Amino acid sequence: MPGQPIIAPSQAERADQSQRMAADGDSFAIHEWKGSGPPQLHVHHEDDEAWHVLEGGLRFRFADQTIDVNAGSTVFVPAGVAHTYVSLPDARYLVVLTPRLRELIAELSSAADRAGDDEIYRRYRSELLE
């Protein structure tokens, strides 16, 4: 059974408790990003992914819930958790990706025909769910 997403609120919203945030694997990249993810719920079967909101906010949708996060918040989505997100107005954020996810995004952004997205996701051990 896949793990659960970890939502770390901004420092101003944090309680005294803390949650451990860690990703398996031996390398990752951090990119500053704007814009939304794919509109469909999707899952990365072997790769973790994380976002840290610098400005504005993001709206994350999971299989059973939708959560808005604001500047200063971090969201960690372990491999196997279905998710997508929408960038709220004026959002600016960091996304933490494995090399495989970075390659998936690059191939999706260069694809001329969206009809082939299912196959592209499969090649990168990911899957569109909607």
What do these predicted ranges mean?
Residues 46-58, 63:
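Glycine- and acidic-residue-biased ligand/ion/polar-headgroup-sensing regions
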Residues 26-27, 35-38, 57-59, 66, ...:
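Short, charged/polar surface micro-motifs in flexible loops or helix N-caps
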Residues 8-42, 47, 96:
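A short glycine-rich, His/Asp/Glu-containing loop-to-beta-strand
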Residues 50, 64-82:
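Short acidic-glycine-tyrosine-enriched beta hairpin
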Residues 1-4, 11:
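Actinobacteria-biased recognition of intrinsically disordered, low-complexity terminal regions
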Residues 79-104:
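Ligand-binding loop in jelly-roll beta-barrel domains
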Residues 104-130:
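Acidic/histidine-enriched, glycine/proline-rich intrinsically disordered or flexible terminal extensions
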